[in-house]
Amino acid sequence: MKAHPKIALAGSVNSSYQTLKKLHEHNMDVVHVFALHPEKAKQVSGYKDLKIFAEELRIPATYFRDINNNDILQLIEKKHVDILFVVGLSQIVKASLLAAPNHGCIGFHPTMLPKGRGRAAIAWTILKNLTPAVTFFQLDRGADSGPILEQIPIDLDRNEYPLTLIEKIKSTINVALDELLPKLKEGKMNPKPQDHSKATYLGVRREEDGCIQWKASAEDVHRLIRANSHPYPGAYSFVNGEKITIYSATLRPEFTGVSGRVIAVEQGNPVITCAEGAIELGEIQSVQPVNWKIGMDLEL
């Protein structure tokens, strides 16, 4: 690969923004930015309008709805892009786009690849107590299966929330790119193939997957609430037929009672018993305020 490659970036979230910021700091030759159109913002948790930031940096930028659109392919060829960074984008990159840059595409994933390939990695990481990471890798036709260029593991706290993990990822992206970008600038890459025999996969998550099952253990309910918290839609339950969305909670192992029942109310916060232990609800959203009382039942 030649030194001082021409770079383009496609993305839609904080990790995309962070990558663009670092590319600029390292004086990489960023010739274009492809920003997911604001019309798609509601479909993306933590959406970031990259076009606005790119224009602040005086980098040409265009919106896209489909990253595989022919107009994008033509623009990559017209600008002689050597490397396309695809960061923070859930759309599948098709073979035609993979082949468009002279030296391919670089992707990002917040797990220790080959473990944790797939979707909703941050939520699954908290839900299943996985090891998060910053991994930059060469995109190929598989799902997060290309050779690894840079990888740094991240410590997961016992009470981690998505927003705190995202902050850790953002700071670790800086460290990883401080290692990777000087190599790319010199025209050097040292890709390491993944061990596909050790691969694990994460499935797509939908809003309804945040429905709380109070017959689960308090630990499991606590993880579900944390995994679905901001910037995601939140875990939820129903009381008196009304939906409540829950964004934070605290374990209260000293309480035992019937699953899904309010066993205490402390400073306005209900303590709900589960199959094992209980949790105290913190941040709650509902159409109407709930007048919590001991003995109230939530839907199981």
Language-model features: where?
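Donor/substrate-binding cores of folate-linked one-carbon enzymes
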Residues: H4-P5, E25-H26, I83-Y201
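Short beta->alpha connector loops
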Residues: S12-S16, R65-N69, L89-I92, S229, ...
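A residue-level signal for conserved active-site and pocket-lining positions in enzyme catalytic cores
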Residues: G11, V33, A54, L84, ...
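Internal alpha/beta domain cores that form substrate/cofactor-binding pockets in large enzymes
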Residues: V31-H37, P60-K79, L84, I92-F108
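N-terminal Rossmann-like dinucleotide-binding module
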Residues: M1-V44
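N-terminal beta-loop-helix "entrance" segment that forms/cooperates
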Residues: E39-L57
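Acyl-group handling in specialized metabolite and lipid biosynthesis
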Residues: G203-A216
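An anion-binding loop in the catalytic cleft
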Residues: K215-L300
